[in-house]
Amino acid sequence: MEPVSNATVYIVDDDAGVREALAWLLRSRRLPSESFDSAEAFEAMLQTRPPQRQPCCLLLDVRMPGMSGLALFDLLVARGSLHTMPVIFLTGHADVPTAVDAVKRGAFDFCEKPFSDNALVDRIEQALAQSGERLAELRERS
């Protein structure tokens, strides 16, 4: 699959090692990313940035101190943000039922830790393609 141009992968995980490993993996596949150490930090960025015009997706840890990944997901659902910003949950084995429930409520997918690099990148590329298609549809309507 061809990389989507001008796309950004947002990484939200409280574990610095996970954030760094994901950022490195994405760089190695020529996928730009921005990392956040908490749901609150990501939410603050969303409040200050202009409306989304480029494809993006969100890699979101389920369990974090403070606002959990699920709480952030619920906020994004309430705002209608999932249409153009697909969410891929990163989860430990114990959180798989929770992640499956989130997929039923609109998350793009979930990947269980430890995950296969190739499988994760494939899902990210699919999520970015979906984001790009939906943004193009919105542009055509306006």
Where are these regions (language model features)?
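Acidic catalytic/metal-coordinating carboxylates
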Residues: 37-38, 68-74
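C-terminal output helix
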Residues: 95-97, 111-125
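Active-site beta3 strand of CheY-like receiver
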Residues: 50-60
